[in-house]
Amino acid sequence: MSTTQRIAAILVRVVVALMLAIHGITRIRLGLVDDLGVFLGEHSFIPIPNVTAWVITLVEILGGTTLALGFVVVPLCGWFTIQLAMGVALVHLQHGWFVVGAGEKGMEYSVVLITALIAVALLHYPVRATSQP
């Protein structure tokens, strides 16, 4: 992989990871973690939704930061891919494709993040201890 390709891969990884971390930070700052727990309790099979909401939020913050730094890349990409796919299934799918414009609350943003996470995971597979690429 060339230096330019490495920089591009790192840029995608860092930006996606920081977006996920900011999402968790914002959920805490706005006091929305309990709301997520209520939503999960009403719309999913999760037995302890409030605890799960906190786990999701903390993994977004700590896992997003860890991913941005280039550690535990493949497992974190897997976690976030599953988390986002569940978000698509539970929230966004019923609203269609578009997030804004022709619709709202759609799945297009989540699909882009999922695709980027899969690409980042593939670039780091098999699992390596370093942040390369």
Describe every region a protein language model picked out.
Residues M1-R29, N50-L58, L62-P133:
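Extended, low-polarity transmembrane helix blocks
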Residues R29-I48:
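Membrane-interface interhelical connector segments
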